[in-house]
């Protein structure tokens, strides 16, 4: 009977159950916290710091969101007055001077500006519409808390007065909402945060060193007009840095969208719950994110340096009636508030001159320039910040040191005669015998191991996009599950097939070699982009590449544990000599091709004795003198796994754990939050006209990156996890292909506007949205019954279908005024040149437009200010937008054009939907929409009434 040497149980051995269990534990131990951090907002403290009151902030938010309050609504004026009262209440509640002196500080002077004087003409909006001109009158509310290092004079009252102290700090929010949303997170939380900042920095112990300007701007939703007109107020010359508070979702965590530089980002590190990645900033820089915030005005036009902090999901509630307090929480308020307090406190307490220097834009404030930054959070509790040139240096160093280290290690292995890699055979000491090493086995499997799962997941992205493109809107995690399950199962299946056909102890090192090459190339690309384009979003590649390099180096160091190739050949010859006395012949090693197909793959349940030929530790096959003889006593080396190469008995059995810990955790920690953040941001952009394929391919790419660290080990998996994932894949695939893509918690947004020809009384209500859903919804409305709903592709919103029908006539103007009187205009044409003066007004509105069929060369609004920081560089203007702080105001606009007639329309807007019955077509749409659909504004006005004009050559 054969004697067996059974190995001791090793919980870290590179065998099936340890590999399956440990890798599963590592992935789950990291993925679960990442998901929790992404979806669970830290609880607000029961006892907030001195100077802050969360309950008060929540009560303010409820008042602010008790109705729609766009700029062109009566409630907007109510909110404006309420803000002034709240600010005065906060300032009136500040303690006496003695309490400040007890803390060795002076009570700060506070100035409140109700800016109902500033106006401005700008061009292009935020969408780079070259043919657009905008005149806007602001109603901003500005609070200036004087810093104890600031000028004590009222310099802003002097003509052309400028501050002589160091630059101050601006914190901005906007108090207007869209006409279809209550504005809880866009931007109600920002507004109540600013109110709390006024309270905090006027509380004893928090007096600022630098001046603090808190801006409540009005008109952000209509192309950032409030921030633009703020530039005309004298106090705007004081701040050099800023913090912009914004919202593009409903609840959740407030993320750091972007920042201008390393120095200004530093104070954000004080935040107790930092959240965000520089990758989102790169999205804005490269144009992948098209929407904008007031950040671009402060940083791009005014030359300030600052940060953009905003809520960013779920986008389905953004600009709808679900952007309310019901769908946010005190915890979300605290998350933004705590970040704002920490960041602002860091900025106003700065005692250096790093935010003072030459202007970085023409006409900008003298804020100097900063260094480009790399930043990201770790589990929502730690913020990592360093300069971009540091990342560049680290990448270059790793790109050079890594290959050199591996080269020198290879040389050392070669000198020690232990370089088994890529070696097919070895010679004995006397060089008479040649023994097989099979050192190349396993090298060529990685392209299949990596390529097949990746190609299939990308193929799934195309399949779902073709069959059910918007399922990701409501079921992003079903898509994630499908991709992950398919990738893991296919990677395991391919690796098991390869391992069955050609088992190799070098599967790990060769897989890591391929991974190292791919990550090295990725690091080169990241280095080039960081150096030439200033894009820091590839920072995760450095950590990914570093982990793979160390794991690969460990595999190289493992080879030192092997016998020299000559020594191994001598062992085989010695074993052959001992066996020849028994009539044995030299057989194949455990990984030889000959006879592999007939040999059953060893598993945990396979007999150690097996059947047929049996091998010794040196993998020589013992056979009896004849086929009926009893086999000689043999020794089976348990340190050789399955049918892998015999020399692998000497390889360490535990180092794979170290390699796993060097590759998987760092990849998940770096890439996991990016994946969640990115998909949360783009999964619901299909309803806005974005192509859904991008989101699915992004999931496939992130899946591949996060699961690639499994490839060196996955061939050791038991079948249990892969087969379970196969079932998950089949179930989620079917669901993703057939399920309805929208739900009452993830609604499809439909863009609404009603256009009225005031000369004829004919109106057209329009929904713009995804086909075929928008057409189905439009046809089901009672007012559309019996009509032919006309649908055509939207001219401005890409990939959206615009469906129109004759709606119920609106009643935005009280009284019995004829429709054509809703908009009034008078045109006076010059007698000697192509110039004309328009006098325009509208009833119960403060927003109108002049549209031209052919562009005018220039225009001027009477009484308007102009600013070279907002230059006019277009060939002509097709549209002039007019905004007034006064209801039923009359604008006087002079235009000039080339020779010929001038045709167009004068349009006025109505955006107030707080009173039922005023806009009955919209009331009907909201009442009869299915639960999975939501209304959002399709234009600045919910109702747009127009009257045509024509100026002939002889007029």
Swiss-Prot record:
It comes from the Eukaryota. Glycans are attached at residues 53, 119, 826. GO terms for biological process: proteolysis. Residues 38-390, 464-473, 530-533, 678-693, 743-955 are vacuolar. One of its GO terms (molecular function) is metal ion binding. Its cofactor is Zn(2+). The keyword Acetylation does not apply. Zn(2+) 2 binds at residues 186, 221, 319. Residues 574-611 are annotated as: Disordered. The record marks 318 as: Transition state stabilizer. The keyword Metal-binding applies. Binds 2 Zn(2+) ions per subunit. Residues 591-603 have a biased composition (Acidic residues). GO terms for cellular component: vacuolar membrane. May be involved in vacuolar sorting and osmoregulation. This is Vacuolar membrane protease.
């Amino acid at each position: 009977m054969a004697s067996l040497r059974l190995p001791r149980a090793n919980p870290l051995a590179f065998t099936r159950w340890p590999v399956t269990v440990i890798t599963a534990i590592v992935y789950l131990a990291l993925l679960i916290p990442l998901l929790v951090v992404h979806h669970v907002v830290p609880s607000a403290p029961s006892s907030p710091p001195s100077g802050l009151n969360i309950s008060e902030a929540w009560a303010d938010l409820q008042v602010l969101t008790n109705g729609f309050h766009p700029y062109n609504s009566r409630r907007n004026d109510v909110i404006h007055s309420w803000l002034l009262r709240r600010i005065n209440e906060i300032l009136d509640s500040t303690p006496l001077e003695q309490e400040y002196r007890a803390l060795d500080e002076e009570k700060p002077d506070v100035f409140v500006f109700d800016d109902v004087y500033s106006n401005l003409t700008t061009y292009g909006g935020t969408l780079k519409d070259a043919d657009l001109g905008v005149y806007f009158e602001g109603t901003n509310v500005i609070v200036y808390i004087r810093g104890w290092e600031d000028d004590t004079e009222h310099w802003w009252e002097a003509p052309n007065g400028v501050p002589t102290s160091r630059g101050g700090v601006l914190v901005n929010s906007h108090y207007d909402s869209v006409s279809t949303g209550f504005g809880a997170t866009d931007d109600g939380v920002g507004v109540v945060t600013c109110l709390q900042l006024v309270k905090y920095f006027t509380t004893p112990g928090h007096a600022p060193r630098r001046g603090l300007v808190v801006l409540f701007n009005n008109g952000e939703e209509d192309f950032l007009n409030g921030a633009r007109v703020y530039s005309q107020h004298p106090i705007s010359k004081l701040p050099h840095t800023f913090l912009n508070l914004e919202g593009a979702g409903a609840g959740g965590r407030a993320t750091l969208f972007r920042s201008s530089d390393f120095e200004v980002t530093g104070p954000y590190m004080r935040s107790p719950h930092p959240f965000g990645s520089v990758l989102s900033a790169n999205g804005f820089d490269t144009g992948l994110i098209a929407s904008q915030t007031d950040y671009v005005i402060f940083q791009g036009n005014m030359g300030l340096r600052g940060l953009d902090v905003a809520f960013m999901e779920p986008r389905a509630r953004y600009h709808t009636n679900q952007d309310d307090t019901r769908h946010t929480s005190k915890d979300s308020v605290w998350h933004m508030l705590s970040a704002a307090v920490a960041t602002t406190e860091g900025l106003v307490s700065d005692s250096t001159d790093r935010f003072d220097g030459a202007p970085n834009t023409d006409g900008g404030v003298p804020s100097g320039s900063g260094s480009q930054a790399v930043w990201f959070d770790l589990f929502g509790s730690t913020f990592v910040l360093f300069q971009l040139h540091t990342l560049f240096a680290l990448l270059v160093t790793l790109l050079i040191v890594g290959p050199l280290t591996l080269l020198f290690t290879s040389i050392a292995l070669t000198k020690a005669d232990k370089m088994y890699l890529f070696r097919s055979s070895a010679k004995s000491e006397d060089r008479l015998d040649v023994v097989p090493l099979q050192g190349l086995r396993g090298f060529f499997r990685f392209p299949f191991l990596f390529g097949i799962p990746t190609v299939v997941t990308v193929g799934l992205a195309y399949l779902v996009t073709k069959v059910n493109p918007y399922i990701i809107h409501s079921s992003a995690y079903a898509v994630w599950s499908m991709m992950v399950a398919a990738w893991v199962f296919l990677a395991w299946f391919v690796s098991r097939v390869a391992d069955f056909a050609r088992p190799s102890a070098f599967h790990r090192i060769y897989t890591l070699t391929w991974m190292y090459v791919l990550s090295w190339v990725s690091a080169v690309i990241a280095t080039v982009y960081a150096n030439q384009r200033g894009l820091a979003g590839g920072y995760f590649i450095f950590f990914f590449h570093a982990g793979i390099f160390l794991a690969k180096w460990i595999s190289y160091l493992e080879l030192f544990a092997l016998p020299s190739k000559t020594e191994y050949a001598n062992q085989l010859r010695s074993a052959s000599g001992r066996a020849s006395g028994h009539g044995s012949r030299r057989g194949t090693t455990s990984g030889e091709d000959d006879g592999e197909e007939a040999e059953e793959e060893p598993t945990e349940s396979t007999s150690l004795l097996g059947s047929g030929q049996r091998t010794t530790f040196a993998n020589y096959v013992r056979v009896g003198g004849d086929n009926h003889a009893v086999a000689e006593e043999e020794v089976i080396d348990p340190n050789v796994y399955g049918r892998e190469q015999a020399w692998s008995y000497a390889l360490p059995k535990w180092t794979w754990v170290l390699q796993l810990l060097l590759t998987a955790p760092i990849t998940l920690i770096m890439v996991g939050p990016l994946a969640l953040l990115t998909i949360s941001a783009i999964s619901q952009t299909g309803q806005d006209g974005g192509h859904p394929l991008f989101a699915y391919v992004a999931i496939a790419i992130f899946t591949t990156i996060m699961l690639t660290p499994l490839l060196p080990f996955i061939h050791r998996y038991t079948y249990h996890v892969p087969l379970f994932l196969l079932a998950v894949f089949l179930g989620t695939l079917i669901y993703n292909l057939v399920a309805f893509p929208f739900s009452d918690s993830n609604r499809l947004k439909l863009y609404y506007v009603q256009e009225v020809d005031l000369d004829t009384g004919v109106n057209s209500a329009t929904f713009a949205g995804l086909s075929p859903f928008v057409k189905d919804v439009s046809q089901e409305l009672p007012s559309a019954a019996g009509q032919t709903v006309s649908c055509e592709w939207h001219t401005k919103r890409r990939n959206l279908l615009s469906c129109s029908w004759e709606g119920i006539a609106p009643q935005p103007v009280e009284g019995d005024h004829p429709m054509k009187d809703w908009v009034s205009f008078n045109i006076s044409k010059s007698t000697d040149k192509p110039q004309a003066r328009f006098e325009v007004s509208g009833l119960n509105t403060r927003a109108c437009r002049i549209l031209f069929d052919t562009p005018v060369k220039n225009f001027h609004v009477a009484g308007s200010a102009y600013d070279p920081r907002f230059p006019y560089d277009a060939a002509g203007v097709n549209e002039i937008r007019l905004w007034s702080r006064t209801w039923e105001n009359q604008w006087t606009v002079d235009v000039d054009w080339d020779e010929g007639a001038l045709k167009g329309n004068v349009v006025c807007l109505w955006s107030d939907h707080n009173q039922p019955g005023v806009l009955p077509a919209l009331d009907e749409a909201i009442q009869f929409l299915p639960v999975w659909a939501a209304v959002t504004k399709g234009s600045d006005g919910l109702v747009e009434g127009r009257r045509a004009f024509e100026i002939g050559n002889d007029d």
